[in-house]
Amino acid sequence: MKIIEVDEELYQYIAAQTQSIGESASDILRRLLNLPTHATSSVDFFESVASAETPKSAVHAEPVLTEKTTEVSQPKVEPVEPPKAVKKQSDEAINHIVDKVRALLNSAEFKEEPKAVVRFLSILRTLYRTNPESFAQATESLQGRTRVYFARDEGTLLVAGNHTKPKQIPDTPYWVITNTNSGRKMLMLEGAMQSMHLPEYLIDEVRPYFVSN
C-alpha cells in the first residue's frame, strides 16, 4: 500500500461530490473518472469527510492510491448500518408535516437567515415537534456503525471528538453534529425526511437552501 498526500483544495472537491450518505471515496472517484463500479467493501466517505476538519488532508483515514492509478483503497472501517425499517405514517400525519415545513420555508425569518446551520436546526426542530415518534425512528435509522449523527445528549457526539461541533436542536431533546458543509447537511435532512416518508417534492423544496460549499 502506498500513501499519497492530497492537498486541501482537491480533498474538499472530492468531498463536495458526495451524492449519498453511503457513497464511498472509491465510488466517488470511479464516478468522476467514468470507471465501472467495483464491488468491494469500502468506507462511507460521508463519514470520513465529516469527521476530518484538518488543514492537511494526508491522514490514514483518507483514500490511498495503490500502484495502479485506476484503483482506490480505503482503511478497514465498518460500513454504515443499512437503514432500519421505520413505521409508515398516516397520510394525514404526513400532510401535517408537509404543511409545517412549508410554513417554515415560506417564513420571512427563515428566508432571511444567512447561516446554513440555523436553517438546518430549524428544519430538524419542525420535523421533531410535528411528529416526535417518527423523527426518533428516522434519526435511529441514520446511525452508522462508526459514526453517530444524532443523539439525546452532547456527550455521545463528543466521543468522536470536539470537531463534531454538536448543537442541540432547539426545543427538542436531540443533539446533532454540525461540522459538515451545506451539501452534507442536506444529505442528513434528506435521509431523515425520506425515513419519515415525506414526499420527494418537499425534499426538493428544501434543497435550494443547502447548496454545497
Swiss-Prot record:
Major localization class: cytoplasm
Protein purpose: Negative regulator of replication initiation, which contributes to regulation of DNA replication and ensures that replication initiation occurs exactly once per chromosome per cell cycle. Binds to pairs of hemimethylated GATC sequences in the oriC region, thus preventing assembly of replication proteins and re-initiation at newly replicated origins. Repression is relieved when the region becomes fully methylated.
Taxonomy, superkingdom: Bacteria
GO cellular component terms given for this protein: cytoplasm
Keywords: Cytoplasm, DNA replication inhibitor, DNA-binding
Coiled-coil portions: none
Subunit details: Homodimer. Polymerizes to form helical filaments.
GO term, biological process aspect, one: negative regulation of DNA-templated DNA replication initiation
Protein name in UniProt: Negative modulator of initiation of replication
Positions of region (Interaction with DNA): 116-117, 145-149, 179-185
GO MF term set: DNA binding
Compartments, as annotated in UniProt: Cytoplasm
InterPro entries: Arc_rbn_hlx_hlx, Ribbon_hlx_hlx, SeqA, SeqA_DNA-bd_C, SeqA_DNA-bd_C_sf, SeqA_N
The encoding gene: seqA
Similarity comment: family membership: Belongs to the SeqA family.
